[in-house]
């Protein structure tokens, strides 16, 4: 009723299949369009690296586009490379004539590269939610980049969102707003 449209990107084939099934089962095909592609800082062909120690079945995560890196940017032992297309957010938004209101980004480590490929589109958004790892220089630089694009960040929200222990220590959603 509010004219909301969602454009989702899921490069991993099994997860993309589940995403499309859920869109169909919930009769949301008129509002949600899913693309089996990865976002990065260039348009073209690449690979999705699937790690040995990660779940490779439907719902699995922590796979990365192009770079053989884990979510924390440490080296990944890759067991499978799935061919994929990559698209920059700016290319997608221009080609589809989209001005995004809200963007959610969770690409398991390479968020800084997605931001670099989407500066024009990100600047037009009202809010951007990005899962970032505060242990990483690249992700702290991404926070600075978002601020340079005119976004604000609620440090209290970030502090509450950060994981307090385990594998994903200091990883959490950052809500940027104007």
What do these predicted regions represent?
Residues 1-178:
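Phosphate/nucleotide-binding beta-alpha loop and adjacent structural elements of enzyme active sites
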